[in-house]
Amino acid sequence: MATYKRILLKLSGESLMGEKQYGIDEKRLAEYAAQIKDIHDLGVQIGIVIGGGNIFRGLSGANKGFDRVKGDQMGMLATVINSLALSSALVAAGVKARVLTAVRMEPIGEFYNKWRAIECMEAGEVVIMSAGTGNPFFTTDTGSSLRGIEIEADVMLKGTRVDGIYTADPEKDPTATKFHDITYDEVLKRGLKVMDLTATCMCKENNLPIIVFDMDTVGNLKKVMQGEEIGTLVHN
């Protein structure tokens, strides 16, 4: 039995690299698809947003001399590549999946709108929402917050390479301690980098809770969905 009926799963592009330095690791992709299938089999309605940092980051491109708008557009295209890859992996695992894009690029994906996304999820498809918000200067964290609010998700699950939110970076500070749950006000007060400020404030204002957890440990996604205390819960 799943704790949540409809979720927004946010995946980082970097996590798709696995052990590689760039691009997509097929083993990691298959592991993610298998984990998503596990919760799909529980009857959960699933929307997904994936970053593009394993291929290109608009902000880092701007720091290297790219026009920021063009750099962000390249980043949006990177998220589409990742979304198509995950869609293919899900189909191979026996799960119906559909890619929606925030900018028109048929036949690569359908143009996104809330009602189409919900219709597809209610029909049992995993919906992967790509190209961010379709606008420059917005991160995929902000895009995932927006989509989670739009599709009326019960929770956003932020799958990362760490097992939750800490008082400091545990890789740099051995005294850092993990939060099992924390309020949005405390996140903002402490300046914790759960997501960028815009994304965090959107979730707070629209009462969308976030669970930050380690997606790279196989089985964790299902454990979260079954109510186990994995990761950190952020709430009002």
Q: Language model features by range: what are they?
A:
Residues 1-236:
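C-terminal catalytic "cap/lid" subdomain
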